[in-house]
C-alpha cells in the first residue's frame, strides 16, 4: 500500500473494525451453556489479558514487516524462518476446517426458525448429512463467484448487532423492573469452578476473544500512528470485555442456561424476551431466525473459499502442485476448495458417531474448534518470544514495552494457552475413541502432513534458496 493511503483510519473506525472482528452473540450463548454466569468475568479477563496483548504482539510484527502486505506467513518467518511460517499459515487454514463443522448445524437450525418458526429437531446423522449437502452447495457457489454476498452479510451482521444491543437494553430494563431471572444472578454463580473441565472450556473464551490478527494489521493505517493504535486497542478491549460480560450476565434473564442449545440459542433468548414483553413470539422467532440464517449462510459462502485463497497466496510457490493452487475465472482456487470439502466430510462424520444428540455433537465440534484455534496464536506467540529473546535488535517503529516486559507477557500467554489446549484436547467425560481419532488424530495427521509437505518442498531448492528460506528476518527489508 502506498504512503498516500496510509494513516487514513480514524480512531472510531478502528474501534468499529475491532468490535466487528471480535464480538459475537453466539459466543455468549456457547459459553453460557458450558459455564453459566461464570463466563461473565472470564470474558472480561480474556479480553484484557489475551486480546489486548496479542493485538500488540501482532502490531509489533506488522511494524517489523512494514514494507510487506503479507500476513501471518511473513510475521512468523521474520522470527522463526520459513518452515514454522508455513506451519502457522497452514494452521490458520486448518482451524477453518473445524469452524465449518460447527457453523453448518447452526445454519440448518436458524433456517428452521426462519421458515418454520421453530427448530425442527433432527438426529446427529440427519444433521451431518444435511450439513454435507449444504457444504457442497456452498463450495459450488463460492467457487463460481458470489459477488452479492458481501453487502448482504454486512446488512444482516448490522441487524444482528442491533438485535444484540436491543436485547441487552430490554433485558436490563426488565431486570431493573423487578423480573425474577431464570438463573439467579449472584456473586457465587459468577465464580468459576477451577477444575480440568473448566480449563478446557477456557479455550472457548479465548476463541471468542480472538480476532486480533485481523485488526492489528491496521497499525500502519491509523491516524496518529502506533500510539493512537495502542490507545484504541486498549479501549476496544475494555469495551468488548464489558459488553461480553454484561451480555453474559443478562443472557439468563428470560431463559435458563440449562435450556439453551448451541444451535438455536440466540432465537431462544429473544423468544423468552418476546414472551415477557408481550410481543408476538412466532414472529420474533422467524425474524431473529431469518437474520441469523442470512448472516451465517452468507458467512459460510464467503468463508468457504476465502481461507483457501488467502493461504495459497501467502505461501511460497511450489509447496503444492500448480493445478491445486490454480485460480479459475472467478479468481478462486476451485480444486483446492473441493479438496477442502473432501477433508471436512470425515471431520463431520467422526464426532457424529459418538454423539447421541445434536447438542452432544455440537459440544464435541465446538470443543475441537476451540482447541484447534489455539494453535495459530500459540505459534505466533512462540515466534514473538524468539523475536524478543534473540532478534530484539531488528528495527521497528513499535514495541510492546521493553524486551523483558515482552518476554514476560508472552511467556504467561504461552503457558495459559498450552494448558488450555491440552485440557480441551482431552476433555473430561468424552468418548475415548473420539479423543484419539478426532482430537489427537486430526491434529497429528494435519500437522504431520504440513511438515512432510514443507520438507518435500525444501529438497527441491538450491542451497542458497534453502538458507534464505530458513533464515529468520530474511524477508524484512
Swiss-Prot record:
Q: Which residues lie on this side of the membrane: Periplasmic?
A: 1-8, 63-83, 142-158, 218-232, 285-286, 357-364, 427-431
Q: What are the disulfide bonds? A: none
Give the way it sits in the membrane: Multi-pass membrane protein
- Ranges per topology, Cytoplasmic: 30-41, 105-120, 180-196, 254-263, 308-335, 386-405, 453-477
Query: Keywords on this record?
Result: Cell inner membrane, Cell membrane, Membrane, Transmembrane, Transmembrane helix, Transport
Query: Which ranges does the record mark as transmembrane?
Result: 9-29, 42-62, 84-104, 121-141, 159-179, 197-217, 233-253, 264-284, 287-307, 336-356, 365-385, 406-426, 432-452
Question: What Pfam families does its record include?
Answer: AA_permease_2
Q: Which domain of life is it from?
A: Bacteria
- Compartments it resides in: Cell inner membrane
Which InterPro entries would you find in this protein's record?
AA/rel_permease1, APC_superfamily
Question: Per its record, what are the GO molecular function terms?
Answer: transmembrane transporter activity
Which GO cellular component terms are attached?
Answer: plasma membrane
Its family? Answer: Belongs to the amino acid-polyamine-organocation (APC) superfamily.
Q: What is this protein called?
A: Inner membrane transporter YgjI
Organism, scientific name: Escherichia coli (strain K12)
Whichever gene encodes this chain, its name is: ygjI
Amino acid at each position: 500500500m502506498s504512503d498516500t493511503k496510509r494513516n487514513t483510519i480514524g480512531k472510531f473506525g478502528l474501534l468499529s473494525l475491532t468490535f466487528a472482528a471480535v464480538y459475537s452473540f453466539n459466543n455468549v450463548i456457547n459459553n453460557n451453556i458450558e459455564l453459566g454466569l461464570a463466563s461473565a468475568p472470564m470474558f472480561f479477563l480474556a479480553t484484557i489479558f489475551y486480546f489486548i496483548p496479542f493485538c500488540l504482539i501482532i502490531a509489533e510484527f506488522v511494524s517489523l514487516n512494514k514494507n510487506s502486505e503479507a500476513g501471518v506467513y511473513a510475521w512468523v518467518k521474520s522470527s522463526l524462518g520459513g518452515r514454522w511460517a508455513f506451519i502457522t499459515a497452514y494452521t490458520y487454514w486448518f482451524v477453518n476446517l473445524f469452524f465449518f463443522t460447527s457453523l453448518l448445524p447452526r445454519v440448518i437450525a436458524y433456517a428452521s426458525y426462519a421458515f418454520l418458526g421453530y427448530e425442527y429437531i433432527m438426529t446427529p446423522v440427519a444433521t451431518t448429512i444435511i450439513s454435507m449437502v449444504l457444504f457442497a452447495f456452498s463450495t459450488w457457489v463460492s467457487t463460481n463467484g458470489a459477488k452479492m454476498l458481501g453487502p448482504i452479510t454486512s446488512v444482516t451482521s448490522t441487524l444482528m448487532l442491533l438485535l444484540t444491543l436491543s436485547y441487552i437494553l430490554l433485558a436490563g430494563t426488565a431486570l431493573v423492573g423487578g423480573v425474577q431471572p431464570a438463573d439467579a444472578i449472584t456473586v457465587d454463580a459468577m465464580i468459576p469452578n477451577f477444575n480440568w473441565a473448566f480449563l478446557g472450556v477456557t479455550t472457548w473464551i479465548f476463541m471468542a476473544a480472538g480476532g486480533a490478527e485481523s485488526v492489528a494489521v491496521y497499525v500502519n493505517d491509523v491516524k496518529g500512528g502506533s500510539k493512537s493504535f495502542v490507545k484504541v486497542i486498549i479501549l476496544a478491549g475494555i469495551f468488548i470485555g464489558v459488553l461480553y460480560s454484561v451480555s453474559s450476565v443478562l443472557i439468563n434473564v428470560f431463559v435458563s442456561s440449562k435450556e439453551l442449545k448451541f444451535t438455536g440459542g440466540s432465537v431462544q433468548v429473544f423468544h423468552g424476551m418476546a414472551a415477557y414483553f408481550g410481543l408476538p413470539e412466532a414472529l420474533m422467532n422467524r425474524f431473529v431466525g431469518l437474520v441469523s440464517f442470512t448472516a451465517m449462510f452468507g458467512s459460510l459462502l464467503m468463508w468457504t473459499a476465502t481461507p483457501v485463497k488467502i493461504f495459497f497466496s501467502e505461501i511460497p510457490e511450489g509447496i503444492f502442485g500448480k493445478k491445486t493452487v490454480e485460480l479459475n475465472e472467478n479468481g478462486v482456487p476451485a480444486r483446492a476448495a473441493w479438496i477442502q470439502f473432501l477433508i471436512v466430510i470425515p471431520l463431520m462424520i467422526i464426532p457424529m458417531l459418538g454423539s447421541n444428540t445434536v447438542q452432544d455433537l455440537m459440544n464435541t465440534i465446538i470443543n475441537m474448534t476451540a482447541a484447534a484455534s489455539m494453535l495459530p496464536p500459540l505459534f505466533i506467540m512462540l515466534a514473538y518470544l524468539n523475536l524478543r529473546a534473540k532478534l530484539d535488535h531488528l528495527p521497528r517503529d513499535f514495541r510492546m514495552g521493553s524486551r523483558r516486559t515482552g518476554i514476560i507477557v508472552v511467556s504467561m500467554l504461552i503457558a495459559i494457552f498450552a494448558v488450555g489446549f491440552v485440557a480441551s484436547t482431552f476433555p473430561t467425560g468424552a468418548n475415548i475413541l473420539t479423543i484419539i481419532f478426532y482430537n489427537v488424530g486430526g491434529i497429528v495427521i494435519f500437522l504431520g502432513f504440513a511438515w512432510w509437505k514443507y520438507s518435500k518442498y525444501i529438497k527441491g531448492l538450491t542451497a542458497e534458496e534453502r538458507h534464505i528460506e530458513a533464515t529468520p528476518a530474511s524477508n524484512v527489508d
